Amino acid sequence: MKISSHEMVPTHEIIPREEIPLLLEKYSIKMQQFPKLLDTDPLVLEIGATPGDVVKITRMSPTAGESTYYRLVIATSL
């Protein structure tokens, strides 16, 4: 089963690496300030994201309409 095909799962997409500096500038943040997403997350595995990638997550909200947020993929520490 593809997790992304479930109606409750928001859209996840990898931001191209060359666009990350623009995103950091837009929000006046550093890479380490993004919320984290583990590289073992089932959706991360499904879209092929690797540590260092930034994932754009777009979901629909009944109050805000479309809501977009970003997460940094990090390696799982063992």
From Swiss-Prot:
| Name of the molecule in the record | DNA-directed RNA polymerase subunit Rpo5
The chemistry this enzyme catalyses reads:
RNA(n) + a ribonucleoside 5'-triphosphate = RNA(n+1) + diphosphate
Q: What GO terms are given for molecular function?
A: DNA binding; DNA-directed RNA polymerase activity
Q: Which keywords are on file for this protein?
A: Cytoplasm, DNA-directed RNA polymerase, Nucleotidyltransferase, Transcription, Transferase
- Which Gene3D superfamilies is this protein grouped with? RPB5-like RNA polymerase subunit
Q: Where in the cell is it found?
A: Cytoplasm
Which taxonomic lineage is given here? Archaea, Methanobacteriati, Methanobacteriota, Methanomada group, Methanococci
> What binding partners and quaternary form does the record give?
Part of the RNA polymerase complex.
The protein's job, in short, is:
DNA-dependent RNA polymerase (RNAP) catalyzes the transcription of DNA into RNA using the four ribonucleoside triphosphates as substrates.
**Could you state one GO biological process linked to this protein?**
tRNA transcription by RNA polymerase III
Q: Which organism is it from?
A: Methanococcus maripaludis (strain DSM 14266 / JCM 13030 / NBRC 101832 / S2 / LL)
Q: What protein family does this chain belong to?
A: Belongs to the archaeal Rpo5/eukaryotic RPB5 RNA polymerase subunit family.
Give yes or no: UniProt keyword Amino-acid biosynthesis: no
Q: Which NCBIfam families match?
A: PRK09570.1 (NF007129)
Q: Name one Pfam family in it.
A: RNA_pol_Rpb5_C
Choose one Gene Ontology CC annotation of this protein and give it: DNA-directed RNA polymerase complex
Entry EC number(s): 2.7.7.6
